[in-house]
From Swiss-Prot:
Catalytic EC class: transferase
Subcellular location: Host nucleus
GO annotation, biological process: DNA-templated DNA replication; viral DNA genome replication
This protein's encoding gene: POL
Stretches the record annotates as Disordered: 1-49
Compositionally biased spans, kind Polar residues: 1-28
Native species: Canine adenovirus serotype 1 (strain CLL) (CAdV-1)
Function, as annotated: Eukaryotic-type DNA polymerase involved in viral genomic replication. DNA synthesis is protein primed, and acts in a strand displacement replication. Assembles in complex with viral pTP, DBP, host NFIA and host POU2F1/OCT1 on viral origin of replication. The polymerase covalently transfers dCMP onto pTP, thereby initiating complementary strand synthesis.
Catalytic activity: DNA(n) + a 2'-deoxyribonucleoside 5'-triphosphate = DNA(n+1) + diphosphate
Disulfide links within the chain: none
CC terms in the record's Gene Ontology section: host cell nucleus
Pfam entry (one): DNA_pol_B_2
Record-given protein name: DNA polymerase
């Protein structure tokens, strides 16, 4: 197999598998193609021309029915057989009896069916009888033996497709394990048949790989959009669930198409929303009330009424264009056309122009805060929507955020035509005729999910004309909790409520310049909230315009109507753009990506996920290091890795896979080092065993990591049963490890390499460079975000859970729950007191005992007013003379259906995950390429140390993070000498070149001098644990300037930490002192769905998180001395690894 240049996506392609790799045949055979040619050539050259015959009523060849037919199948015991049977049951039975000198028994002369066959066999009383039940390639055998035989010969019947046949003969067969064909002596299977059998027929592998669906990134040109941009302010309310944040203020602004904005403004005015700005064009609407949940109820009413208005508007539009619906409704016995159900409407052929209406509820960080606070009020879908609409909902809480909360009201699209020509899809276009429905979509979108930065930083990054203000949150909180707050001499909120002195003075000066009299904290908070909404509204417009320009110019899709808010996150947008570029390059002409890239599913999904190994992050030195340290960082590590070749195509069947594995084994036996771009090696995912070289040939940057001990460890121990990519196999082999490929049915080999994402990364790099030249900060931010987000979309982890409201459980889901396919994992209820309409107070009822004489116990007034009809009626047999009283607690009548506020978390009963969205193997290979980068990096530092024991080596690196390495002065010298071609300052490529295949990556020194820009170092540093370290300063060896250092403390409040604090913490622990170092920070606990009694669903509670600061205790490395750490190895094994590995020793067999 050889590597050739692609004419589509730039990359490396392999030639089709060579025809010589075919299964060996036991005898001569004639290929079907040759047989056809031979048959065609055998026709008589001088054949007489056909004579025109008279026209016949029936055409076609008359073929006599074959007397004997045959099938091949597998018996219960696994044996393959061929069953020959007679096509005519009656005549075959008669001939069989006559041959054995018997007359046909009367019982067998009756019509024989599948149901009466066992009874008739017992009546015939043959010495031995069999029934073979055939179903989908397998046969189930049932035996009968007569105690007093009437027939001396056996009867054998075949039941196939509901019919009964008499078996003539049963003979053994063989079956090809690669293509599933049955044969007796010889067999030759084709590559196409082997592939089809493996991917579509074989029960164990037929559902391992799924095609990835595709839809263009654009939207119909006539889509109507409305944006409701809002923000809320909260105060702390102390309740039974802790300090709960309660909104008391909500401000929103309306953007979008003019007619939709006007409709929403009219509705806001009707519902008495206050106006913050008198200008109608930029008016903001707000509501202020400290009443708990009142804000949510009012906002819910606005959103529900808006849904009803647009739904009625769309239905009126359809009704005007289809007046015949009035007649259809009358024919169905309905008074109003809107009473037609969604299923009934699908049967009618609608006319007219479709409408596509999208309403976005937008805010900054609302999916992690605001929407959770309001969710108990706004999540309901039960609005007054005509039943003619088909309603669907996508509600997905994940990791403390509302990832999706979308509702769609849809009607059939009269313009819909199934696509046959997909050329416009290659340009990212979506026509009205491509969509099956016309719709109204209500979607929640978060600008934080599209920018990954605070609103203050987003205003700078996207060059907005307004900027975020400041608010004394704690003062507002105390005002609502206590009725007052601390003020300075001028009546301004005290300094303690502000971030620092600078923020306090700046805001106080602004207040004084406004000259509005006494400080009104509520008005100031309203102005602050309104300013946030204005900033967010500008950001929304900026994102829409800038992404449209980016798609048009940088991606070169000028005809695409792209809306970045159509997808909720930057990751989902980057993945959609990547698939669009790939679709344009490969032109599959289908509604999916064909076999260009496929998604692992079911058993294969878990297998591929096992090959995804995380980043490297650990110190090899604990304590204070009093020597220079340089910090190197890989430039755009994931982006560079994405430009390299990746596996493409439909995975090979077991036969071709075995041939490809043999090529790897041969290369590892014959060559000490193997090229990553060897033409004979195909990409794959393998199960391996690997043994490291001798102890003195190891280093502190192992080529691979393992989870066998329960935690991810970068280890030099022997590897057993690890799932790796073919790149890791080469990396381990080149580092001196002995790698053995273990037979595994899940082992996957792909037919070719392709640079699938190279074009995507290249255009983002070009856009970023162009933005730098033109100083376009917005385009630079977009290009950088999209470039970094793609890898994460491939690594998305799926699960079998989904959260639904009770009213979303349709008949198909209910059936799956009843059958056990789904299990209700938990049920949660949103806060119900906000839905309360009426409360009946507590009351007591006393019930008198049952007695045969009611008049004797009843008061006189009762007897006179309600005389009994039969005063002599008998009472019950057993009398009860004790009074019984019942105390009824207050009854709450809810203004909602129970289905509206009951959430169910459903989980599939099977652990297997169906995946048709993400090519997870791409994420695995991205990380494998990064490990190859670091492996090459380690050779620059440690190649000369081979043969020297680890404890005698010079310290060259002290800390390694995912894409960075902290080196000593000796490590810096080696990088300047041996690794100079990988230094960005010396020039080099960040994008892989298919014409000159080699590892492509660059690093740069992150510790730079602030004055002259030269490489600088930290004169002293301290390392306590992974992601917990500090650099004292940055000292420039050129100009001697000493700049500020760097501190990293994940999970801690870094505002209270410094280099001296971390240093003191280390020495206190070393000397076993009594000092305790800890940090505290305010944390927000977001709860969406929960089964815990002390946690209320859809709430945000405020808690103080305190963490102890201390050196690394539960290390995942071996301590060589008081400071130095080395990875586990044979000499120093991982104490956590208790897993038993069974091995077969050759000398004992």
């Amino acid at each position: 197999m050889s590597l050739v240049q692609s004419h589509g996506t730039s990359g490396l392609f392999t030639e089709p598998p060579n025809s010589i790799n075919q299964q060996e045949s036991s005898g001569p055979s004639l290929p079907a193609q040759d047989a056809t040619q031979a048959s065609a050539s055998s026709a008589r050259a001088g054949a007489t021309p056909a004579i025109n015959s008279t026209k016949r009523k029936y055409r076609g060849a008359v073929v006599a029915q074959r007397a004997t037919l045959s099938i091949s199948a597998i018996l219960d015991n696994g044996q393959c057989v061929q069953i020959k049977y007679h096509s005519n049951l009656a005549s075959a039975l008669t001939n069989l009896c006559n041959t054995n000198l018997y007359d046909l028994p009367a019982c067998l002369n009756k019509p024989i069916t599948v149901h009466n066959l066992p009874t008739l066999i017992e009546e015939a009383a043959a010495s031995y009888s069999l029934i073979y039940y055939y179903q989908r390639g397998t046969v189930r055998k049932v035996e009968f033996r007569a105690e007093i035989p009437l027939l001396s010969f056996p009867l054998k019947f075949l039941v196939k497709h509901g019919k009964v046949f008499l078996i003539k003969d049963i003979s053994p067969m063989q079956r090809c394990e690669f293509c599933g064909s049955f044969f007796k002596v010889t067999h030759t299977c084709t590559l196409r048949r082997r592939d089809f059998y493996f991917h579509h027929v074989a029960s164990h592998s037929g559902d391992w790989w799924e095609k990835i669906s595709f839809s263009p990134i654009g939207a119909p040109a006539n889509t109507e959009r409305l944006f409701i941009v809002y923000d809320v302010e909260t105060y702390t309310w102390h309740g039974k669930f802790g300090k709960q944040l309660v909104p008391f203020m909500l401000v929103f602004q309306l953007l979008g198409d003019e007619h939709l904005v006007n409709a929403a403004k009219n509705l806001a005015t009707t519902q008495n929303w206050d106006t913050w700005n008198s200008n109608e064009q930029t008016a903001l609407y707000y509501c202020i009330t400290p009443e708990k949940r009142a804000i949510g109820v009012k906002f819910k009413t606005f959103r529900d009424t808006l849904q009803q208005h647009f739904a009625n508007n769309l239905w009126s539009h359809v009704l005007c264009q289809n007046p015949k619906l009035m007649e259809e409704a009358a024919a169905l016995g309905l008074e109003n056309p809107e009473d037609i159900t969604a299923n009934q409407l699908k049967k009618f052929k609608l006319q007219g122009t479709p409408r596509f209406i999208e309403v976005y509820v937008v805010g900054h960080n609302i999916t992690g805060f605001d929407e959770i606070l309001l969710a108990a009020q706004v999540v309901s879908t039960r609005a007054e929507i005509p039943p003619v609409f088909d309603i669907s909902r996508n509600f997905m809480p994940r990791a403390g955020r509302l990832l999706f909360n979308d509702i769609t009201y849809s009607l059939p699209n009269p313009s819909y035509v199934p696509s046959k020509d997909y050329r416009h899809w290659e340009q990212g276009q979506v026509l009205a005729s491509d969509l099956k429905t016309q719709y109204i979509k209500f979607m929640v979108r978060d600008t934080f999910s599209l920018t990954h930065t605070s609103l203050k930083n987003a205003a700078k990054a996207y060059s907005l004309t307004v900027s975020k203000g400041c608010c004394p949150y704690q003062a507002v909180n105390e005002f609502y909790m206590l009725g007052s707050y601390q003020q300075d001499a001028d009546g301004f909120p005290d300094l303690k409520y502000w971030k620092d002195q600078e923020e306090y003075c700046f805001n106080k000066d602004l207040w004084k310049k406004e000259k509005k009299g006494a400080y009104d904290i509520i008005q100031q908070t309203l102005d602050y909230c309104a300013l946030d909404v204005q900033v967010t509204a500008q950001l929304v417009n900026k994102l829409i315009e800038s992404y449209q320009i980016f798609i048009k110019n940088s991606v070169n899709l000028p005809e695409t109507y792209f809306n970045v808010f159509q997808r909720p996150t930057i990751s989902s947008n980057s993945h959609a753009i990547f698939k669009q570029i790939l679709y344009r390059a490969e032109k599959p002409n289908a509604p999916h990506l064909n076999t260009i890239i496929m998604a692992p599913s079911n058993e294969m999904y878990e297998y591929v996920r096992l090959s995804i190994r995380g980043g490297r992050c650990y110190p090899t030195y604990i304590g204070v290091l009093q020597e220079p340290v340089f910090v190197y960082d890989i430039c755009g590590m994931y982006a560079s890795a994405l430009t390299h070749p990746f596996p493409a195509g439909s995975p090979l069947n077991p036969y071709e896979r075995a041939v490809a594995i043999k090529a790897y084994e041969h290369k590892m036996q014959e060559h000490k080092t193997i090229s990553y771009f060897d033409e004979d090696l195909l990409p794959g995912i393998f199960t391996i065993d690997a043994d490291p070289p001798a102890e003195e040939f190891l280093d502190v940057l192992p080529p691979f990591c393992s989870r066998k001990g329960g935690r991810l460890c970068w280890t030099n121990e022997p590897l057993r049963g690890e799932v790796t990519t073919s790149i890791d196999v080469i990396t381990l082999h080149n580092r001196g490890w002995k790698v053995t490929l273990i037979p595994d049915t899940r082992t996957t080999v792909f037919p070719e390499w392709k640079c699938l994402a190279r074009e995507y990364v290249q255009l983002n790099i070009n856009a970023k460079e162009k933005a730098d030249k033109s100083k376009n900060q917005t385009m630079r931010s977009i290009a950088k975000l999209l470039s970094n987000a793609l890898y994460g979309s491939f690594a998305t982890k799926l699960d079998n859970k989904k959260t639904v409201f009770s009213d979303q459980i349709e008949s198909n889901i209910a059936k799956e729950i009843a059958s056990g396919a789904y299990v209700v994992k938990s049920s949660s209820y949103i806060e119900t007191d906000n839905l309360c309409a009426e409360i009946m107070p507590e009351f007591v009822v006393a019930y008198p005992p049952v007695n045969f004489d009611v008049h004797r116990l009843a008061p006189p007034s009762y007897s006179e007013e309600y005389p009994t009809e039969n005063p002599h009626a008998e009472g019950p047999f057993m009398q009860n003379f004790n009074m019984t009283s019942y105390r009824y607690k207050p009854i709450m009548f809810i203004d909602a259906e129970d289905d509206d506020f009951c959430l169910h978390t459903l989980e599939k009963s099977t652990p297997l995950i169906t995946n048709n969205r993400y090519a997870s193997q791409i994420a695995s290979f991205v990380l494998a390429w990064t490990r190859a980068f670091v492996s090459e990096w380690s050779q620059f530092l440690y190649e000369n140390d081979a043969g020297i024991p680890l404890e005698k080596r010079i310290l060259k690196s002290v800390y390694g993070d995912t894409d960075s390495l902290f080196t000593t002065m000796e490590g810096y010298r080696l990088m300047e000498e041996k690794g100079k071609r990988r230094l960005k300052k010396n020039g080099g490529n960040l994008v892989f070149d298919p014409n000159n295949p080699e590892l492509t990556w660059l690093v740069e020194c992150e510790t730079k001098c602030e004055k002259c820009g030269a490489d600088a170092y930290s004169s002293e540093s301290v390392y306590l644990a992974p992601k917990l370290y500090a650099l004292k300063d940055t000292t420039c060896p050129e100009c001697q300037y000493v700049g500020k250092g760097k501190l990293r403390a994940k999970g801690h409040a870094t505002s209270t930490l410094s280099y001296d604090v971390l240093k003191a913490c280390y020495y206190a622990d070393l000397q076993q002192g009594s000092d305790i170092f800890k940090t505290s920070r305010m944390s927000l606990r977001r709860t969406l769905t929960s089964v815990q009694t002390h946690v209320q669903p859809f709430t945000v509670t405020e808690t103080t998180l305190t963490r102890k600061l201390r050196p690394w205790k539960d290390k995942t490395l071996h301590a060589l001395d008081m400071n130095r750490l080395i990875p586990y190895s044979r000499k120093y094994p991982n104490p956590r690894n208790n897993e038993t590995t069974w091995m077969e020793l050759q000398w004992m067999t």
